[in-house]
């Protein structure tokens, strides 16, 4: 591991832990007894360019996937929000690969649904693996396992365990800062029940496809593109 004080700012990834101001977030914090319930990846430490798996819209808590998060998503009028930002030194090659991966996933975000089944397994410290489908902590772990040997992408980590491993790189902890820029997505757009149902059905279909591809791999046949 590189010493963070000797690492150029451009060669750091940032892991952002957040206490989200919504009911599900509060419930998760009660169950886990941890002050933070959400984790994101940032390329520059700013809160107007974070990447994670989360709800797509404010009123669709069970419809989510890969998102680029802007600071407006957690602003104060939605409730009190705390944040903790940890910096992680990486090589130029690791930074470049992570940046390219995030750009690719942003361009194809519809292919990456939220892993609801795995989310319900969290209290039991279990995971449900589905290709391209993660919870926020699973996605952060997947990224971290490619740049930090302390993280094993095959294992289960609680958000608290991730915090503890990254705590030496903490650069900020406290109230969520006021947004520096306007929200560039449709997070606050109201969605109808029909919209919600249609996308829930689509996510089920994607998961079935993931299972089909996994079974074909186990049987030795090549997975379809």
Per-segment meaning from a language model:
Residues 1-225:
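Cysteine-nucleophile amide-bond enzymes
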